[in-house]
A protein has these predicted regions:
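Conserved, mostly hydrophobic/aromatic
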Residues: 27, 48, 70, 110, ...
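A general structural motif
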Residues: 240-244, 262-267
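Metal- or metallocofactor-binding catalytic centers and their adjacent structured scaffolds
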Residues: 46-121
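Structured beta-strand/loop patches that form or line metal/cofactor-binding pockets in enzymes
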Residues: 8-56
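Glycine-rich, aromatic-flanked loop segments that form ligand/cofactor-binding clefts
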Residues: 111-149
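N-terminal export leaders
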Residues: 1-7
Length: 267
């Protein structure tokens, strides 16, 4: 109850520091610029301030939602009301029906452009617009795929990926690829992840390690693999079960001592 009260209070608190802006910042133009499969968002205020953001690669499929579901709502609005706008846009045009990545990526693209505009106006980094700077430097981890490959090839590709740059952390995929396959009954080779986990830890004792199952396991399977991750000192287990199966997520989290993370499509 205490933890929930703290979370509720944090959610109710304002995020953007509106006091930094004395007069309205009216969004006069919102553009989505395209070069091939790459997109930029550019916003301008009525007073000529400008902000730019780089869109996620999936904008090539989601740009109609940006143009029809998000852009019209924000045009003419005061950017100082960003907190409220990010909530009310879900009501506009029944946008809540597109919750998750479908709406989240176009919306985040515009949000970043607006924050860039406000940051340029004040000369402040975004961290100073929405809070305080806690970490002047952020470590970068190497995310890898390869879960559809046989064990030895998977492990080799992970090592090759790490050799490209100096990383202090690594994320591996466990479970099995549930997309990009026509086989409706595709299953992970028995014992593959169970063998991969200690192989990676033994090879990289100095690295911070993460594991992502992309929702492959049921509760029992996730707990079993999670305990192997714990034994090998992995820092967190991402999407052990389907991201919207909240009771299953809780069951896994309660059974493990390590942190359990949910995915980017969950809002």
């Amino acid at each position: 109850a205490v933890r929930k009260a703290l979370l509720d209070a944090a959610l109710a608190a304002p995020v953007l520091k509106k006091g930094l802006f004395r007069s309205p910042v009216i969004l006069e133009s919102i553009e989505l610029l395209r070069q091939g499969s790459r997109f930029l968002c550019r916003v301008r205020s009525r007073d000529g301030a400008e902000g730019v953001s780089v869109a996620h690669s999936t904008m090539s499929r989601l740009y109609p939602l940006f143009l029809h579901n998000i852009q019209p709502f924000f045009l003419g609005k005061d950017a100082r009301d960003l907190d409220q706008l990010l909530e009310k846009v879900f009501i506009y045009g029944f946008n809540f029906r597109y919750n998750g990545i479908s709406l989240g990526i176009p919306l985040a693209t515009l949000e970043f452009a607006i924050l860039d505009l406000l940051g340029r106006m004040t000369g402040l980094p975004v961290t100073k617009l929405v809070g305080d700077l806690h970490h002047p430097q952020v470590e970068v981890y190497r995310a890898t795929e390869f879960r559809e490959l046989p064990l030895e090839e998977h492990f080799r590709r992970v090592k090759e990926s790490l050799a490209e740059h100096e990383f202090t952390a690594l994320k591996i995929k466990v479970g099995y690829l549930m997309y990009m396959t026509a086989d409706l009954n595709a299953k992970e080779p028995v014992g593959k992840s169970e063998r991969l986990i200690p192989m990676v830890r033994e090879a990289y004792p100095q690295l911070t390690l993460y594991a992502d199952a992309n929702g492959y396991y049921d509760v029992a399977g996730a707990i079993r693999v999670g305990r192997i991750l714990q034994e090998n000192k992995f820092a967190y287990f991402e999407e052990p079960v389907m991201y919207d199966h909240f009771e299953d997520i809780k069951a896994v989290a309660d059974a493990l001592e390590m942190p359990v993370a949910n995915g980017e499509q969950d809002q």
